Amino acid sequence: MSFFGFGQSVEVEILLNDAESRKRAEHKTEDGKKEKYFLFYDGETVSGKVSLALKNPNKRLEHQGIKIEFIGQIELYYDRGNHHEFVSLVKDLARPGEITQSQAFDFEFTHVEKPYESYTGQNVKLRYFLRATISRRLNDVVKEMDIVVHTLSTYPELNSSIKMEVGIEDCLHIEFEYNKSKYHLKDVIVGKIYFLLVRIKIKHMEIDIIKRETTGTGPNVYHENDTIAKYEIMDGAPVRGESIPIRLFLAGYELTPTMRDINKKFSVRYYLNLVLIDEEERRYFKQQEVVLWRKGDIVRKSMSHQAAIASQRFEGTTSLGEVRTPSQLSDNNCRQ
């Protein structure tokens, strides 16, 4: 709560009408801690009251008006002075005058558009909040209350498997397969690795889940890679013809839905990174983008349509070239 010099005269509180029944969700704060906030979805009404309690009943509080705002904004940490608002709604609660006793003002924002998921990342924060303001001649009295928004999707109508042969010419050829290209946040990644040719002494193989956060545009683009999980799928030397199964449960990891070009400010993408390490500690890897989405119980045709036409682009640098193309790694990486 920010009182700015007049905080001792009045206490401001924002109360939601359905606070007792509304679900709360954990959300990471900027300092890395997790706190629980009231959970909302796109299109839901936000209603409640702003309560003003005079701390000294014998004193009056003059003001230039009282208002409540619902705001959705994006803050880029390298540009903290500018807040980019994509939702901004305001309701006037009282005209200029005096507050002579404690009182409450009702408010309602009907069917509020909340197009993006709440997000706190390495270089960007997307938040929704209510802000009550008592306008004063010198310093305003301000109270904010954050909420969390989740974006829901239905099962994608198109969800093909991922299958690819990669390798180093005359040294290593493998075939990997993942059962889907799109996974919900509580899903299980099922797949297999099949060794077609092994002339490198591989001692270890793992799959990493990598989150890539991209912020900014043009020359001011920042990329932040975060390894969310490391999953060992093999310890020891494989032989030709060997097949290694993959079964990776996503529910145990801190993941968000894939976010693409959010308000032209940032993106969040996820990659499965297949890593092989040989006896000389050299690393060979292949990245494959997958789409993550939040499964919802509410069926919405518009969301289903968006999920069906969502573009599939699998990008990312790789050290294992596809078998059908010339390898960028030299043959001296092989060990007979």
Curated annotation (Swiss-Prot):
InterPro entries: Arrestin-like_C, Vps26-related
Superkingdom assignment: Eukaryota
Keywords per UniProt: Cytoplasm, Endosome, Membrane, Phosphoprotein, Protein transport, Transport
Membrane topology: Peripheral membrane protein
Segments passing through the bilayer: none
Record PTM Phosphoserine, positions in chain: S302, S304, S319
Function: Acts as a component of the retromer cargo-selective complex (CSC). The CSC is believed to be the core functional component of retromer or respective retromer complex variants acting to prevent missorting of selected transmembrane cargo proteins into the lysosomal degradation pathway. The recruitment of the CSC to the endosomal membrane involves RAB7A and SNX3. The SNX-BAR retromer mediates retrograde transport of cargo proteins from endosomes to the trans-Golgi network (TGN) and is involved in endosome-to-plasma membrane transport for cargo protein recycling.
Protein name per UniProt: Vacuolar protein sorting-associated protein 26B
Organism expressing this protein natively: Homo sapiens
Gene name linked to the record: VPS26B
